[in-house]
């Protein structure tokens, strides 16, 4: 950045930080966007006059509520719930619900802000929101989770609707919980409606929802490689996590002829030197408890306790586990081991210093707001199916998903002129921020 850009960023960051003191995750996300788009805003008099980016940093509203429910022992439990309705410039508020013990409004604000840019990139009529509760479903019985879900939706129901705010699942909230909450909303509203996405198919959910983020990640990665004259075939992929995103990304990678060499969990890494076979992947997905740490020898898979998935030589890194999982040392390891591409399956999984090091090393990096947009894309397709009282086949949904992810890639490459690396390749991180910002800015100007 030049001195003028540095000054713009410093002044802007100071103003935002004064209003959001101590909200580390949120300020990190805002700073990343601001670094890329402030000079564009200042070069456009209409954008400058409307103070587009500063307005985009403020959520429309934050809804806070208590969730009172009873556990199996008959004891009253009290949790807190939130819904950050960030922006409905482009369509109904849209974003997931997560139930995590230490959830905070700061994390939800960061996720909702990121969601606004991710949803804008899809080209679909989707606003942005995020919500959840400081509830940990692990160790809770099915009955307790149902009672909590019922109490949570009873409080949230008045604030959402098919044309207002359409939540989805996220960490701790799967299709079963979405199904319970959808039914509670219908009873509250006294009508049927596609008010939540990620529903069980029997309740109006879409085919391919579970696969969407992982498959979409591979479709975007394949488009990146194609732009460089390469394919996935034979590429070594280091993957983190073993949840839905990871397992379906691994499945699609194997299907495309790539060699998935790692997956990971809290205690360490599963390493397949010659690549996961479909059988090894199925075994790992199904394995429960401590049995997962002792793979059968026939699978040619080992578990390495206390290790991270980034120490294995690879061509492509796909971080799919959690925020800030790749730090500077991990980035150095990846670059030194020959990694040339990175695409984010998780939200903000790479720290700023790691991003900078990978960029200096010439690693092409696709941010989560573009690369993991498959989940929200299929959520949007579920909304279309619900609104039209129709149901699409898995093949139809998959075809639409592939098209959306390739269109997102094309949208980013169209920003090449102002968003390129020193070698002339597309700077995907900056291009994603710029392309999404332009769509949101034009909508804000049009709205007056």
Which residues does each PLM region occupy?
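Adenosine-phosphate binding glycine-rich loop
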Residues: 2-29, 224, 335-448
């Amino acid at each position: 950045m030049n001195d003028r850009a540095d000054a713009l960023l410093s002044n802007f960051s100071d103003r935002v930080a004064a209003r959001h003191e101590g909200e580390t995750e949120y300020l990190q996300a805002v700073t990343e966007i601001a670094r890329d788009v402030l000079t564009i805003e200042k070069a456009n008099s209409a954008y400058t006059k409307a103070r587009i980016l500063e307005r985009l940093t403020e959520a429309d509203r934050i809804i806070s509520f208590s969730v009172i429910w009873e556990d199996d022992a008959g004891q009253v439990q009290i949790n807190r719930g939130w819904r950050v309705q960030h922006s409905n410039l482009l369509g109904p508020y849209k974003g997931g619900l997560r139930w995590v013990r230490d959830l905070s409004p700061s994390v939800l604000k960061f996720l909702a802000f990121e969601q606004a840019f991710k949803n804008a990139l899809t080209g679909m009529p989707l606003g942005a929101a995020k919500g959840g509760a400081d509830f940990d479903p692990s160790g809770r019985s099915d009955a307790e989770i149902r009672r909590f879900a019922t109490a949570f939706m009873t409080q949230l129901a008045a604030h959402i609707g098919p044309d207002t705010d359409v939540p989805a699942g996220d960490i701790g909230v799967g299709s079963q919980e979405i199904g319970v909450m959808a039914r509670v909303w219908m009873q509250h509203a006294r009508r049927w409606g596609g008010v939540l996405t990620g529903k069980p198919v029997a309740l109006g959910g879409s085919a391919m929802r579970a696969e969407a983020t992982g498959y979409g990640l591979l479709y975007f990665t394949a488009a990146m490689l194609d732009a460089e004259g390469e394919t996935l075939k034979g590429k070594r992929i280091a993957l983190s996590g073993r949840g839905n995103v990871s397992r379906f990304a691994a499945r699609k990678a194997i299907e495309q002829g790539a060699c998935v060499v790692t997956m990971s969990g809290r205690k360490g890494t599963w390493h397949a030197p010659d690549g996961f076979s479909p059988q090894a992947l199925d075994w790992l997905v199904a394995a429960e408890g401590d049995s997962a740490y002792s793979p059968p020898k026939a699978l040619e898979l080992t578990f390495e306790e206390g290790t991270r998935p980034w120490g294995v030589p690879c061509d492509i890194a796909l971080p799919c586990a959690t925020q800030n999982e790749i730090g500077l040392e991990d980035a150095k390891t990846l670059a030194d081991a020959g990694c040339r591409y990175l695409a984010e399956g998780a939200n903000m999984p790479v720290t700023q210093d790691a991003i900078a090091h990978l960029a200096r090393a010439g690693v092409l990096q696709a941010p989560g707001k573009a690369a993991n947009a498959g989940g929200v894309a299929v959520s949007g397709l579920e909304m279309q199916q619900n609104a039209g009282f129709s149901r699409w086949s898995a093949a139809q949904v998959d075809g639409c998903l592939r098209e959306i992810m390739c269109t997102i890639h094309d949208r980013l490459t169209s920003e090449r002129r102002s968003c390129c690396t020193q070698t002339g390749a597309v700077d995907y991180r900056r291009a994603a921020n710029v392309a999404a910002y332009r769509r949101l800015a034009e909508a804000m100007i049009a709205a007056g």
